[in-house]
């Protein structure tokens, strides 16, 4: 990612993991 702030890096990483998991759950339902 583009941030130099480690806390923001962690938040972005967690957000991307959550989005990826939501996408998998959505695909499994369809």
UniProtKB/Swiss-Prot annotation:
InterPro entries: CRF. Signal peptide: none annotated. It is found in: Secreted. Disulfide bonds: none annotated. The modification Valine amide is found at residue 30. Keywords: Amidation, Hormone, Secreted. Its main location: secreted. GO terms for molecular function: hormone activity. Belongs to the sauvagine/corticotropin-releasing factor/urotensin I family. Regulation of fluid secretion. May stimulate primary urine secretion by Malpighian tubules and causes a dose-dependent stimulation of cAMP levels in the tubules. This is Diuretic hormone 2.
